[in-house]
Design a protein with these regions (language model features):
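Generic structural signal for buried aliphatic residues
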Residues: 32, 84-85, 94, 164-167
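Active-site nucleophilic cysteine motif
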Residues: 106, 121-137, 141
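Beta-loop motif signature
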Residues: 5-28, 71-91
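Aromatic- and glycine-rich peptidoglycan recognition patches
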Residues: 2-14, 93, 183-227
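...with weaker cross-activation on analogous glycine-rich loops/strands in unrelated enzymes
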Residues: 139-203
Length: 227
């Protein structure tokens, strides 16, 4: 069975409880497969990136074979995605795609607060930021930073980096824990406390307000453009 997110944003949780960690958000127009349905909660798999989690049964609708909502006496086509709504608000037609993920991040998300699992201007995490900005450019990324680090092609060094390349960062154990979008000129836009622009060098992200490195550079990847 397929479902549709008809609200602006719906939390996906690690467990079937409102107190459980929010691991992701569905945005309006997102579709998904129902893996397990209980009285109050359903476990789903997102069609876009395969991400799994639990959502409240009051916050989704059944999607019929022809793309129509079939429950709650509704008969309507899925509404436009939140990304399309944002692009339209920025002056682009609803069906338009942007040219640069970095531009989307700068123009639509700069200053948005950090929220673990978030994917909207009201709150967004590092890999949520990269995913929605690349989606606006018709480039598909997986949900987590560690997953995104397996996509695209490797960039050998920061000297060879181009605007819109993905920059990944590791913890002391070598695990990928953070991602941002390279802006060029040794600058990166990323979500850390808020969506912000910081300096980037071969060591990592340098926060000039705190006078320290906050993230250590691990690798860079480039997503090929669709022909």
């Amino acid at each position: 069975m397929k479902g549709l997110c008809f609200l602006s944003a719906v939390p996906m949780r690690a467990e079937q409880s409102d107190r459980s960690e929010m691991v992701n958000q569905l945005l309006q127009g997102d579709t998904f497969e129902i893996l397990e349905q209980q009285e109050k909660w359903s476990r789903i798999r997102c069609d876009y990136d395969g991400y799994e989690g639990w959502i409240d049964n009051k916050q989704w609708r059944v999607l019929g074979d022809e793309g129509q909502v079939t429950s709650d006496n509704r008969q309507q086509k899925p509404q436009e995605t939140a990304t399309a709504s944002l692009l339209r608000a920025a002056g682009a037609p609803p069906t338009a795609t942007a040219d640069s993920p970095a531009e989307v991040a700068e123009h639509l998300y700069l200053g948005a607060p950090y929220l673990w699992g978030g994917r909207t201007v009201m709150g967004i995490d590092c890999s949520g930021l990269t995913q929605v900005c690349f989606k606006a450019c018709d480039l598909r990324l997986l949900r987590n930073a560690s997953q995104q680090a397996t996509q695209g092609i490797a960039v050998a060094s920061l000297d060879e980096a181009q605007r819109d390349d993905l920059c990944f960062f590791h913890n002391d154990q070598g695990r990928i824990i953070h991602v941002g979008i390279y802006l060029g000129d040794s600058r990166i836009i990323h979500a850390s406390g808020m969506v912000r622009i910081d300096r980037l060098d071969t060591t990592g992200i340098y926060n000039e307000e705190r006078h320290c490195y906050t993230h250590h550079l691990a690798l860079l990847r480039r997503m090929p453009r669709k022909s």
